Curated annotation (Swiss-Prot):
EC identifiers of the protein: 3.6.1.66
Species: Oceanobacillus iheyensis (strain DSM 14371 / CIP 107618 / JCM 11309 / KCTC 3954 / HTE831)
Protein name: dITP/XTP pyrophosphatase
Catalytic activity from the UniProt record: XTP + H2O = XMP + diphosphate + H(+); dITP + H2O = dIMP + diphosphate + H(+); ITP + H2O = IMP + diphosphate + H(+)
Molecular functions per Gene Ontology: dITP diphosphatase activity; ITP diphosphatase activity; metal ion binding; nucleotide binding; ribonucleoside triphosphate phosphatase activity; XTP diphosphatase activity
BP GO annotations: nucleotide metabolic process; purine nucleoside triphosphate catabolic process
Keyword Nucleotide-binding: yes
Any one cellular-component term (Gene Ontology): cytosol
Keyword Hydrolase: yes
Family affiliation: Belongs to the HAM1 NTPase family.
Length: 197
């Protein structure tokens, strides 16, 4: 079985990547699975692409192997695209999903239902030694619910209702969520690069 490093320490993302890559007969190894401690890579980029590339390229260089990294976030139209690049730490450091959700709900409390459109974005960077870094981008369109619902998933899943559904991502069965998520949509595009790994 082929192996690929996924440059994340986020347990939720690591679990999703492992499930996605298993269908391609590829073992996804997260930074949490490695025997050595990897310091956090500072996300100093000004775009999702730059942040994903920073992580993928640094880890690829360190281990001299193919690495996939993602940078993802929630873009809310009524908040001019916030939390955007700062989705994980929207309420400040250290990162806290509950605090982030509460901040978004507070900022959205007076926004009418028809103005609550939002989308998740996932940008994947594929870095390999001696090769140009490639990118795949996936989206999941939907809107922001007025309150939290559900206990599956992570991040903003309890307040995000995907298009064509009437429940939040956190209320969906994890297998169903993985079929429609922004990460899955990005990974679907990634398939064309997998033969080069």
């Amino acid at each position: 079985m082929k192996k690929i490093i996924v440059a994340t320490k986020n347990k939720g993302k690591a679990k999703e990547f492992k499930e996605f890559f298993a269908s391609f007969d590829i073992e996804a190894i997260s930074l949490l699975d490695l025997p050595e401690s990897i310091p956090d890579i500072e996300e100093t980029g000004t775009t999702f692409e730059e942040n994903a590339a920073l992580k993928a390229e640094q880890i690829s260089e360190r281990f001299n192997t193919a690495v996939i990294a993602d940078d993802s976030g929630l873009l809310i139209d009524a908040l001019d695209g916030r939390p955007g690049l700062y989705s994980a730490r929207y309420a400040g450091e250290p990162t806290n999903d509950q605090a982030n959700i509460e901040k978004v709900l507070k900022e959205m409390q007076d926004v009418p239902d028809n103005d609550r459109s939002a989308r998740f974005i996932c940008v994947l960077a594929i870095a390999q030694p001696g090769k140009e870094t490639n990118f795949c981008t996936g989206y999941c369109e939907g809107h922001i619910h007025s309150k939290q619902k559900g206990d599956h998933g992570f991040g903003y899943d309890p307040i995000f209702i995907p298009k064509k559904y009437d429940v939040t991502m956190a209320e969906l069965d994890p297998a169903k969520k993985n079929q429609i998520s922004h990460r899955k949509n990005a990974i679907d595009q990634l398939e064309k690069w997998l033969h080069t790994i």
